[in-house]
Amino acid sequence: MTDAPFDRADIDALLDARHPDPFACLGPHRVGDATVVRTLLPGALRVRAIAAGGGVLGELRQVDPAGCFAGALPDGRERGERPRYRLSIDWPDARQDVEDAYAFGTLLDEDALARFAAGDPRAALACLGARALDMDGVPGVRFAVWAPGASRVSVVGDFNGWDARRHPMRLRRPWGVWELFVPRIGAGERYKFALRARDGAALPLKADPCACRTEAPPRTASIVADLDALERFGWHDDAWLRARASLDLAHAPVSIYEVHPESWLRVAAEGNRSATWDELAQRLIPYAAGMGFSHVELTPIAEYPFGGSWGYQSLSPFAPSARFGPPEGFARFVEHAHAAGLGVIVDWVPAHFPDDPHGLGKFDGTALFEHADPREGWHPDWHTHVFNVGRREVGAFLIASALAWAHRYHVDGIRVDAVASMLYRDYSRAAGEWVPNVYGGRENLESIAFLKHFNDTLHGPAAPPGVATFAEESTAWPGVTAPTAEHGLGFDFKWNMGWMHDTLAYLREDPIHRRHHHDRLTFGLVYAFSERFVLPLSHDEVVHGKGSLAAKMPGDAWQRLANLRAYFGFMWAHPGKKLLFMGGEFAQWGEFAHDATPQWDLLDAPAHRGVQRLVRDLNRLHAAEPALHALDDRPAGFAWLVGDDRNNSVFAFVRRDDAGRMLVAVCNFTPVPRTDYRLGLPAPGRWAEVLNTDGAAYGGTDAGNGGALQADEIPAHGERWSAALRLPPLATLWLRPA
């Protein structure tokens, strides 16, 4: 080999890890009639260029003792052809033969990059992150990261000793995306990005925002995921997916078991660690299916650094948390769920993200993912950054993560957290602490557009058919579940937070005072059909001093459980889909604690087993009775029979389906049994008592009507027929024409 020039300024910039364009000097370059190869390999003793067969093409001379080598290849190729060579590197303890990362051309398609910049989530999914693949027949990993404000980005990891000088990346300047193909590494490699801000200042090492796998906290590196293995995963849920695509979920029975997977099951013999996905598949799935739930909903499982956030402060929205094992484990979990007849819903948090130094905040030295103005970009309640969803690339990044959960893991639903905080610019902000929109209003127009884009994408051809979207939205914002074509947000369902707050406030009252709060239980029907609702008894209501569901109830232990059973009977008969957080199904006394399991030992007590049995029976009856779900979102599916008996705290209503089938629910929310309570009924003859929450099997007194009653032609409550009922104390009855 002949000598080859290596500019001193380039050498200094490379050694300082501040060169803005490493491909301009590293790798093969045509200089006159020769091909010059330059490489930066700090710590290398000797470097030679070798042919594919192993023959030595020549020596690269060390031009700087810090690790800069250069030399000219013998000219034996056509002009314009990429030179074929490998580097044979002598390290102090080993020899390595590897392709030159700087001998490869551009990696990402310009059209895909342009679509990403325009806000296309499919392009974000295709372009960004780490992908093990072959380039020109060479195996390796393609890295790509969006960081338009950085002056230099390197990928670092175990494969280069975490040395930012070794693998500086190429900037695709119009789009702000940095890329590099690193040969001869693969899935399982740990890595991060080393960035310099525009002023040259070194930033903390950053995890990959689009990493599909991470280290388990408290470690923070990204890991190259085996996406090929995920894409080749042996799914056997084709029948489930076909049925899901044709299912009208709004008019189907939906009962959701909300689970914090980190604490639902812990392994005490191994330091109280969380269960793996495979362990949860063996325990949680048969339990939830056996309880009659239609879905499990998981609090956020995208990797999150702080366990005390319960997952709601995620930094890696594409990566299932390593707390539970590798990504393939989550795929197996979903596969098991579908085989058992359970859908899987995941919580998703596009509103905000935490301030951890390895995360998204000031990612490239600028406010990249967040707003620059703290009045828009900092959340005062949670002390987190607010995503700038109005920036096209940020919106594409977030929606791409939702698509990834749907495509890679076959999830059946995505529940969007904290929607209200996104919709209002003054959410939790005092006057002067927020920025009005362009019209001077408080509505966040960018978030509205983002949420519509999210729903249109998840309901469009880019996503698998039948994926449902849920909004945790706590205000009276109109049209949350209206189609985007009708100026709605486009969600399938909205959590009915108002119903939850009102009904729990009623149940907290001593029964003697409930007559003064009667409207709290009836008010929900004023707006019950304005949206498609989920009735949520979620984790948020059993934490931070609010008390568990059972602990909220007044009275002694028996009365508390009786109140809760009656409430469950009322809730499962009420219009709206059902959601119950873990522990509530057996009336645990303690609040949710993220570092402890539910109080499973309470199931040794018959009273708590009785509540559990009731929830199971409610789920099964709810699924079997079309009147209880077929018209959940339509006024024709509900009518009050007794809505004004505040003196007795008695409520009664009828549920119907569009075929005329009906079921009547009657609730007595006092501890006083009511004998000969005449109730108007919509049909004559024999009525079966299909459910009594005071049944002995549920821990009650077994008072009731002996399983049946007769409706005679005696007018009452606006109906032609009526029956004299015995109403058990603190109980709900379900009646159906026999």
Swiss-Prot record:
Keywords, sorted A to Z: Carbohydrate metabolism, Glycogen biosynthesis, Glycogen metabolism, Glycosyltransferase, Transferase
Transmembrane regions: none
Pathway where it operates: Glycan biosynthesis; glycogen biosynthesis
SUPFAM superfamilies linked: (Trans)glycosidases, E set domains, Glycosyl hydrolase domain
Role this protein plays: Catalyzes the formation of the alpha-1,6-glucosidic linkages in glycogen by scission of a 1,4-alpha-linked oligosaccharide from growing alpha-1,4-glucan chains and the subsequent attachment of the oligosaccharide to the alpha-1,6 position.
Assembly and binders: Monomer.
UniProt protein name: 1,4-alpha-glucan branching enzyme GlgB
